[in-house]
């Protein structure tokens, strides 16, 4: 665990790089990571942005709007995590790894104040002994973690994959 002064110093560093962050969000994020590290000393972390599609208004096709409210409900992020876990469990079953428990750690925040369009920032935590890389995320047809993440988001939104796969964005420094 971080001491209060260490958490304050971390917040200064984070805010210098990314902008303002809630001290409560930072504290919770550090706790999630610490708890995951206590279970798995070797951790693979993935940073990803999950976006909503934009649908033009019928009267003005050039004016973007957000996706229908029924999809923007809080359950969409829950469906995302459930779909990703389901895909991983199915893969583990196919590979005969059903006896070994699997844990997915995650941190998420919905950005809607500083952005024109609401979207999620997500960090996924994996036991590095099980999963240690995204794979080629430029290939939508690959059998890798990047594809599973994209499929999970499309399923959460109830949209077709790979048609909406680009709604998932992996920043250049996505893997840790």
Task: State what each model feature region is.
Residues 2-40, 128-176:
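Catalytic "initiation/cleavage/transfer" segments centered on a nucleophilic residue
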Residues 47, 88-106, 159-176:
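Short glycine-rich, low-complexity/disordered patches
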Residues 54-103:
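Short N-terminal edge-element motif at the start of the domain
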Residues 39-42, 100, 114-117:
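Intrinsically disordered, low-complexity regulatory regions enriched in Ser/Pro/Gly/Thr
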Residues 43-59:
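Active-site-flanking beta-strand signature of metal-NTP-handling nucleotidyl enzymes
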Residues 33-37, 96-97, 105-114:
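Catalytic micro-motifs at enzyme active sites that drive phosphoryl/nucleotidyl and oxygen chemistry
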Residues 105-131:
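Histidine-centered divalent-metal-coordination microenvironment in nucleic-acid enzymes
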Residues 57, 93, 118, 129-136:
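Short, solvent-exposed secondary-structure capping/transition elements
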């Amino acid at each position: 665990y971080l001491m209060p002064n260490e958490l304050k110093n971390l917040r200064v560093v984070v805010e210098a790089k990314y902008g303002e962050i809630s001290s409560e969000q930072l504290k919770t994020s550090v706790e999630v990571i610490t708890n995951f590290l206590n279970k798995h000393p070797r951790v693979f972390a993935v940073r990803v942005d999950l976006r909503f599609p934009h649908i033009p208004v019928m009267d003005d096709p050039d004016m973007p709007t957000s996706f229908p409210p029924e999809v923007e409900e809080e359950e969409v992020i829950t469906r995302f995590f459930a779909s990703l876990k389901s895909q991983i469990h199915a893969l583990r079953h196919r590979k005969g790894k059903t006896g070994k428990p699997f844990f997915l750690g995650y941190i998420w925040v919905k950005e809607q104040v500083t952005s024109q369009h609401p979207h999620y920032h997500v960090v996924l935590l994996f036991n590095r002994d099980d999963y240690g890389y995204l794979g080629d995320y430029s290939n939508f047809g690959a059998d890798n973690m990047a594809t599973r993440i994209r499929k999970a988001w499309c399923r959460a939104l109830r949209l077709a994959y790979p048609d909406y796969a680009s709604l998932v964005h992996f920043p250049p420094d996505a893997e840790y």
